[in-house]
């Protein structure tokens, strides 16, 4: 069974927020958001299948729909039947799969730096990273990750953090075969024919300076979804929730309030 980390509910009847990381797959990506959201939500984070605490060998042909099915089953086992989703890139697209397959379960969806279909630019970035992984190995692949995730000015000011992250990712690397299969799943996800069927209210957050996924991809996704709002950050890069947490949280809370107002603990 997939392992989930489920926080205590902050008050009786608190809504559930499921956080889904991107290609790296580790729930620790959401550390800053866990702290912020745990005041109003029962928070669920997890390491995706084939990564971290959920080590496994992924099958050939593994898809984002498979990822969504696995997560939904694990949530049901934990007694979670209705939840909001906060997903980054791959995680946001897994959220779309959940909204399409289980519309009665997903109360709201927030997609951070996601897309409707893979852009030529993002495909070029992925293919370059794949070649780096295959030709030079995992250490070189991991060393290059910050180039795609962070604005240069932020990275320059956070060198000790980048070095610590690099050491952590090397120690917990998901494996070349797993990573390639997750990349295959991500590159082949396409919602152009299905987006109009999403009835879940969606907030889309993107960063104008994202070097991996052009912000216009979020704009195209917004235009294709029937019930969505688009919030664009001027700074933050692909990992904008990490590099600019306060502006990100302000947009996130405003969006969540408009999509699905959270019940608050009664005061006497």
Swiss-Prot record:
It holds the Pfam family Abhydrolase_1. One of its GO terms (molecular function) is hydrolase activity, acting on carbon-nitrogen (but not peptide) bonds, in linear amides. One of its GO terms (biological process) is uracil catabolic process. Keywords: Hydrolase. GO terms for cellular component: membrane. Its EC number is 3.5.1.-. The keyword Translocase does not apply. Residues 15-119 form the AB hydrolase-1 domain. It is an enzyme of class 3 (hydrolase). It catalyses: carbamate + 2 H(+) = NH4(+) + CO2. HAMAP family: RutD (MF_00832). Belongs to the AB hydrolase superfamily. Hydrolase RutD family. Involved in pyrimidine catabolism. May facilitate the hydrolysis of carbamate, a reaction that can also occur spontaneously. This is Putative carbamate hydrolase RutD. It comes from Cronobacter sakazakii (strain ATCC BAA-894).
């Amino acid at each position: 069974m997939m392992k989930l980390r489920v926080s205590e509910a902050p008050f009786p009847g608190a809504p559930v927020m499921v956080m889904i990381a991107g290609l790296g797959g580790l729930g620790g990506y959401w550390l800053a958001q866990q702290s912020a959201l745990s005041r109003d939500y029962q928070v669920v984070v997890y390491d995706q299948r084939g990564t971290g605490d959920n080590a496994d060998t992924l099958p050939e042909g593994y898809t984002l729909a498979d990822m969504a099915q696995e997560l939904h089953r694990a949530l049901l086992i934990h007694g979670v039947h209705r939840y909001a989703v906060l997903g980054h890139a791959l995680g946001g697209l897994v959220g779309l799969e959940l909204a399409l397959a289980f519309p009665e379960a997903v109360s709201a969806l927030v997609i951070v730096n996601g897309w409707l279909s893979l852009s030529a630019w993002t495909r070029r970035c992925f293919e370059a990273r794949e070649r780096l992984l295959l030709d030079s190995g995992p250490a070189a692949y991991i060393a290059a990750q910050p180039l795609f995730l962070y604005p240069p000015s932020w990275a320059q000011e956070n060198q000790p953090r980048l070095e610590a992250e690099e050491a952590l990712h090397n120690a917990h690397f998901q494996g070349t075969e797993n990573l390639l299969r997750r990349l295959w799943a991500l590159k082949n996800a396409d919602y152009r024919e299905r987006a109009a069927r999403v009835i879940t209210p969606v907030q889309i957050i993107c960063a104008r300076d994202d070097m991996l996924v052009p912000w216009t991809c979020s704009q195209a996704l917004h235009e294709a979804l029937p019930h969505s709002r688009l919030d664009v950050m001027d700074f933050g890069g692909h990992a904008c929730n990490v590099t600019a947490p306060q502006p990100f949280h302000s947009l996130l809370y405003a969006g969540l309030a408009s999509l699905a107002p959270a019940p608050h603990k009664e005061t006497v």
